[in-house]
Amino acid sequence: MDKVLLGALEAGGTKMVCATGYADGTVVESQSFPTTTPEETTATCAAWFKDKGIAALGIGAFGPTAVNPTSPRYGQILETPKTAWRYFDLLGNLQGPLGVPCGYDTDVNVACLGEVTFGCAQGLTDVVYLTIGTGVGAGVLSGGKLVHGMMHPEAGHIPLVPDPRDPIANDGACPYHKNCLEGLVAGPAIAKRWNGKKGSEMADDPEAMDLLAGYLGQALAVYILCYAPQRIIIGGGVGDHTPIVPLSRAKTAEVLNNYIVTPEVADLDTYIVNNSLDGKQGVMGCLELARQALEA
């Protein structure tokens, strides 16, 4: 299996990352394409993979998307703000031209899978992977399996208590929920609050980082209470390029208020951590998803 060439596709709202590699997580080749129309984008990606001779493909898609194989909409993008992509059959438009087994899940679930298989969550059975960038999404591993249920978790949209210091309190950037985590900490919220600036441009502003870390701490406390993970891993542009992760530890502890007493939560420095695979966790998770599809 280690010598069988596999395909990986991170399907994002702004770009598609196509890659080939092996079951041990080694990435052989990768190339990014802009996300344009559904038809053009999938045709470009399928053509790129067609020449590589892959045996299977793992797809991690932006969401919401239908990840339950028994659903009649399995493989489709669902109620996304990207209107042209709503109810587009992403899986079918890739698997059809390629004719190889395909694994399909969300982008954050495959990132979680990457960390569990190759990164800082190896050996763990219960993990939350959170990405904070243009949006906020969470991948959840419970009992050694990625959580799906009726669909995948949408934990980036949990409602939060607005901070009275916040100029966009009750008017966050999420078009669906004004005071959800995504609406208050993702890139568009940062830009709305601070005159178009990026998270990295606000990284040295203590008050700004304290505000964002407070929101993240609220959310992480909820994830701990609901999912009881053995580790929480955070990635994405805002997560990687600001001090929000270390600052959120004290905020999380404040919300929990000593209610959870476990060895893991006692050491938040090793419990709430940044991603460990240098941004490759999504692609590497897709390779693992492809391996699973080939062996199914």
What do the PLM-derived regions correspond to, one by one?
Residues 1-57, 65-73, 92-102, 114-126, ...:
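ATP-binding/phosphotransfer module of carbohydrate and carboxylate kinases, centering on a glycine-rich
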Residues 147-164:
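A conserved active-site-flanking secondary-structure segment within enzyme catalytic domains
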Residues 107, 133, 286:
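Active-site glycine-centered loops adjacent to acidic/histidine catalytic or metal-binding residues
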Residues 136-138:
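Active-site histidine-anchored catalytic micro-motif
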Residues 30-32, 80, 149:
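Residue-level detector of high-confidence beta-strand sites
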Residues 103, 109:
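Glycine/small-residue-rich loop that forms an oxyanion/phosphate-binding "nest" at active or ligand-binding sites
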Residues 71-87:
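A charged helix-plus-loop insertion that forms the helical arch/lid used to bind
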